[in-house]
Structures are given as C-alpha cells and as structure tokens.
C-alpha cells in the first residue's frame, strides 16, 4: 500500500525530527505514521478507473510491520478516508503475499512474497511502471 497507493515520504514529513531520530532506520515502526500519508499521485483515480472497468476483482494487499500495531488499523483508516466504501472491505494484510491468488499484483518491492506471487508482478516505481498512468495503460490491453 505504502509506496503504491500511499506516499510514505509525505507521512514521514509530518512527523517531528525528534520522532524521526528515535526511529532512525525503522521509520515504519512510528505509531500513527500510516494514517498521515497522502495518496500517491494518480493512485485514487486509478483505483476507481480499474474498479469501474469491471474486468478486475480489485483488492488492496498490504503488509504491516510487526512492531507497529497501529499500522494495521491506520491502513484501514487511510483507505476509509481516501477511497470509497467498497475498498475498506477489500483490504488483505499479510506477510505472505505469495499465498494469495490473482492475475496481477501491483507492488513496489519484492518482499513478503511479492516476487513469488503466482500471477504477474507489476513493479510500481520501476522504469517500466514509474506511475499509475503506465499501470493503467498496461492493464487496458490485458
């Protein structure tokens, strides 16, 4: 979710310097951080376009840090704030993304089972898929 739908850096920018120093090299453990993030450019519009297309059964698949219990609820609250009622019931939080079935997985990192996912991994932020517009163009011809 973060790095694909939610802009991690935007949340981090809203946290005090003192908190950033305390959590240096483990920013994802900052309580409340995930609820502070702004949407990635084009992400909300892309989610709605893919949903309206009707060809894809769309879910939000994410991982939450084990040492940050608020991240689990923060991610749900983020979806409720930025997306419609459909999506808050379509969040799956797991550390084993490869256990889920699907044709496509849009993710920015090959961790937590992403690189072993059975379907096609669309690596968000890569040279091939630098933004949501490139992802939408790719999915339109599938």
Q: Where do the PLM segments sit?
A:
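Structural recognition of alpha->loop->beta junctions
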Residues: 77-92
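Active-site neighborhood of HAD-like aspartate-dependent phosphohydrolases
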Residues: 1-35
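Short, well-ordered beta-to-alpha junction loops that form the rim of enzyme active sites
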Residues: 1, 62-64, 108-110
